[in-house]
């Protein structure tokens, strides 16, 4: 198992960094929405945009991964997610933020699909469950830590 995890270390590290930043960004964005004085409807639309992207994303992600492969798809989703997260402060508009959150949801589900497919392909039947358990533990821990980092004083 250690050998399999060593082979996938960079993949685990990448998804952990992105899960951490996504956890922090989701919580921070909710605070910024309230601070910006958006209506309750806008808050709901922006917040649900991410999950809408996660629902519709797999239908598009599969074709992209099939055409360009795991590594390129993971890189494309990670880059697009990073760009979308960085665009929020430049345009304070609820419709634009909803659009960005949909893009972020599609990108995160794309990276999850790439990661899980990669783990499934590279792990043997004997250790696959343990590797997936470690992956799930790391992702959930990093999302939680990302949310907790907002409590750290400036």
Spans of features found by a protein language model:
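Helix-loop boundary and gating motifs at the non-cytosolic
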Residues: 2-51
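Short hydrophobic/alpha-helical segments at membrane-entry points of transmembrane helices
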Residues: 11, 95-101
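Loop-to-transmembrane helix entry/capping segments in MFS-fold secondary transporters
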Residues: 40-41, 125-135
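Residue-level signature of mid-helix packing/kink "hotspots" within the transmembrane helices
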Residues: 51-59, 143-144
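Helix-to-loop junctions at the C-terminal end of transmembrane segments
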Residues: 57-69, 150, 154
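Helix-breaking motifs and short loop linkers at transmembrane-helix boundaries and internal kinks
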Residues: 69, 90-92
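Structural signature of the two symmetry-related core transmembrane helices
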Residues: 72-86
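Intracellular juxtamembrane helix-capping segments at the cytosolic ends
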Residues: 110-123
